């Protein structure tokens, strides 16, 4: 098999990275994708750094053994902790994801920018460096959201539980003064509709899925690794939990409009 015909690997701590996979499949419809969700060990956002590194390398080895030509680390926490180590150890294009703060700043008209993310993403040096670029000129507030990925892992993406969780998190803010909300975890796009409801559609909601997918395409094109055959690609999903319910949920989220 030529390198062009090999699949693209996607990895996340659970089902969240499927939000990025959806964007990538739209942008690269001829490609085959292998997705590995580590729901057995989710969430990563409250774990120790060394544990996240070990789990990320395990997932990467799983996908490398399947013959992938590129890897997308579709997990903000794993990206912030492990991306440099991965690039040093594997000789394929490796694309990470980080909170889409730059587009939020570019769209900002003087309001508050809120970054929703896991506690670990917000605590990492990579995030601090990102904040340093803009903190002098922008009103940016990190909002840790522990427990939210766990709800989404259970398939709870709407309804009273999600609404009340978000209502509580945003109760301290004046919706009129929020310019943008950056979704700094790949699980969060699945609760975007409820988030709009809670914030009365006042804020622009931004996630990094499109930017990450565009970077994936750019790197594959520059390396002459894009699939050329005129065909419709396929998506195959694996999960460390190895039960039918989590695989069914994964495909359901992938097909969710």
UniProtKB/Swiss-Prot annotation:
Function recorded in the entry: Provides the (R)-glutamate required for cell wall biosynthesis.
Family: Belongs to the aspartate/glutamate racemases family.
Protein name per its UniProtKB record: Glutamate racemase
Catalytic activity line of the entry: L-glutamate = D-glutamate
Alphabetized GO MF terms: glutamate racemase activity
Active site as annotated: 75 (proton donor/acceptor), 185 (proton donor/acceptor)
EC number(s) stated in the UniProt entry for this protein: 5.1.1.3
Key words of the record: Cell shape, Cell wall biogenesis/degradation, Isomerase, Peptidoglycan synthesis
GO biological process entries: cell wall organization; peptidoglycan biosynthetic process; regulation of cell shape
Leading EC class: isomerase
Family annotation (Pfam families): Asp_Glu_race
